[in-house]
């Protein structure tokens, strides 16, 4: 893969569906993941292993992971909150475990029901648990750019957490703009500082389009050296424990941006759009994505018949 390739990690099966009030059948989740696996994605966040009381929409994570047809070259990621979740994910043969902790103490207490210090201690237990297993670890720094309870987050706080995760032996880092509070200048600055600590291959950016800056933030991060980005088909998703955390950046809109700007990527947009157009029937409402509605710039329309008659 070329060094300038933008890698899209598809998160709709997990982050996209976790706040949906309508139950999506297990077979439909599996079918969605299997379809995504054929469209050029190399990474898919396929589900989570959290308490069904906390996230009832994803209570079938075990069945989903056991039911998918694993495509060669695709890494299937599971979000886990604790060691119990890690044990379930290992049993279900997840390829990568994604741990989550907030840069904000208040949000971490709301989301994880514990302090940041206790979360970090628990991560050490998980690192020990997976030793010897053929699984990689990633840690998401939630509210890395801003918190709906505390406001702007000190960049040094984020860098401290990145250092702490790396010292534990966690290989991957995600910076998450959990409630869409980031702006491009802020993104450029923080990404550059984090890339002084970790290689681009270990860094993922997770943006929300809550305030309309999602794709602008992607472009800022890409130009600062980041290469991997979370995105959700149709723009589905949000955090149930963060006020105002509307949808993730839309996968097809991001791929369209890449194609229009000739940024290398691996996703087949022409085949992705029909899949996105099935989402309203799946979740029972319209979805935020734009390109699935408008079509690509190359999808031209016939001119009105009268045009040919005008001199």
Q: What are the residue ranges of the model-derived segments?
A:
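Catalytic cores and adjacent flexible loops of soluble metabolic enzymes
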Residues: 1-311
């Amino acid at each position: 893969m070329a060094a300038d390739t933008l890698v899209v990690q598809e998160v709709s099966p997990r982050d996209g569906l976790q706040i949906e009030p309508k139950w999506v059948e297990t077979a439909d989740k599996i079918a969605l993941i299997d379809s995504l696996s054929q469209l050029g994605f190399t990474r898919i966040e396929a589900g989570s292993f959290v308490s069904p009381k906390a996230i009832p929409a994803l209570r079938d994570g075990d069945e989903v992971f056991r039911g998918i047809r694993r495509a060669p070259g695709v890494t299937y990621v599971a979000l886990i909150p604790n060691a119990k979740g890690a044990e379930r994910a290992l049993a279900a043969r997840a390829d990568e475990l994604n741990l989550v902790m907030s840069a904000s103490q208040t949000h971490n207490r709301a989301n994880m029901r514990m302090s940041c210090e206790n979360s970090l201690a628990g991560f050490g237990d998980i690192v020990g648990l997976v030793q010897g297993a053929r699984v990689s670890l990633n840690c998401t720094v939630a509210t890395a750019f801003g918190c709906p309870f505390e406001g702007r987050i000190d960049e040094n706080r984020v860098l401290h957490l990145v250092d702490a995760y790396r010292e534990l032996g966690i290989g991957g880092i995600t910076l998450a703009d959990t409630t869409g509070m980031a702006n491009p200048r802020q993104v450029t600055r923080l990404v550059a500082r984090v890339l002084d600590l970790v290689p681009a291959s270990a860094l993922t950016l997770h943006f929300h389009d809550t305030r309309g800056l999602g794709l602008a933030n992607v472009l800022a991060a890409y130009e600062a050296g980041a290469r991997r980005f979370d995105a959700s088909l149709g723009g589905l998703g949000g955090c149930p424990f963060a006020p105002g955390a509307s949808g993730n950046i839309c996968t097809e809109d991001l791929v369209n941006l890449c194609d229009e700007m000739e940024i290398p990527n691996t996703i087949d947009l022409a085949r992705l759009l029909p899949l996105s157009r099935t989402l309203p029937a799946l979740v029972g409402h319209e979805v935020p994505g734009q390109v699935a509605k408008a079509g690509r710039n190359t999808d031209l329309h016939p001119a009105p018949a009268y045009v040919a008659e005008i001199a």
